[in-house]
Structure formats: structure tokens, C-alpha cells
Amino acid sequence: MTRGKPDRKATKKNSAPSFSRRKLWCFRLMAMVGMPLVFFSLVELAFRTLGFGYPTAFLLHSSNHGEKTFVQNNQFGWRFFGPHLARSPNPISISQEKPSDTIRIFVFGESAAYGDPQPRFGLPRMLEAMLALRHPEKRFEVINAAMTGINSHVILPLSRDCAEAHGDVWVIYMGNNEVIGPFGAGTVFGSQTTPLP
């Protein structure tokens, strides 16, 4: 090797592309997050294509004598409590296209709003009867979207699903189950608090 000439092997080695530490960590992070995300997305797509699982929306699209309707999903509570503990919502069948002469009212809440143990005599039914008596010239549609044993973390997705039905008024009567309900601090599902001394 002479003094004035550069070494060709060393030049080739130095000119090869090198990843910086930042690019390497970005690649690793994308692989750690991206690969599982792609995998689970494909599994979810396969399950939906094959018909596994159950619908999770509160209102399901249906039809009655050619008219498009919304009906209740009796499996809605399964994702929060499982099939053995979940309660079913009150039967619902309403037109997807709200009639122009109708005022559609949704009642959200827990067992008190639902009318447990007899929903026929609960808040939604009383509200419907009082409105019909007070305003006989108007048509009211009061939908009992309350369920027994739920609290705000269940009412939020339930109300988002009901937004598709274009309600005019939402009545919210809740709060009892936030502490003593299924996920409150005072039950077996919630964190157990120690009694005060």
C-alpha cells in the first residue's frame, strides 16, 4: 500500500448506507405496534366475514312489513357484563325515518328510569301518558332506552347509538348506580373500599 492512494476496501465500507439510531428505533417501534395491529385487524375482518360474534350497537337495523325500523339489541349488555349477568333492554321498534309530525323522546338511565320491576308503569310510560293528555293534538314517541344495572360508562355508548334515530328530546335520569351500581365502589365489580373507623 502506498501513501498517496486510498484503500478501496475501506472506501466501500464507509460509503455503505447506515441507519442512525433514531431510524432504527422508529423501525422497531413501527414493527412492535404495526405488526400486531395488522394481525388483529385481519383476524377481526375474518371473524366479521365468517359471521362470528354478536352486534354491539344498542339499536339494530330491521324492517317491518317493508318499513325500515330500529329494534333493540338484546345482546347489548353482553360486552359489559357477559351473557349470564346482562339485562335486556325494553322492547323497541321505531321507524328509521322519523315522521315529521312526531316528537321523538328518548329516556336514558338506570333501573329507576327503566321502571324496574314493571316498565309498563315506569317513567317513560308515565311521561308518554302525561304528554298525550296535555297535548292531544301532537304525536309523541317515547322510547325507553334505560336499562337496569348500568351506569354512565354504559349510557354513553348507548346514547351515541340512539343519536342515529334522530330524537328530538333526550331525558336523562341517572346517578343512582355510580356508587352502588355494578361498577361502583360499593359492589363486587368495583374496588372495595375499607369501612370507616
What is each of the regions a protein language model found here?
Residues 28-46:
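Hydrophobic membrane-insertion alpha-helices, especially the h-region
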Residues 122, 126-166:
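A conserved hydrophobic secondary-structure block that centers on an alpha-helix together
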Residues 24, 89, 154-157:
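Short, conserved clusters of charged catalytic residues that mark active-site
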Residues 104-107, 141-146, 169-174:
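Structural recognition of the beta-strand scaffold that forms the well-ordered cores
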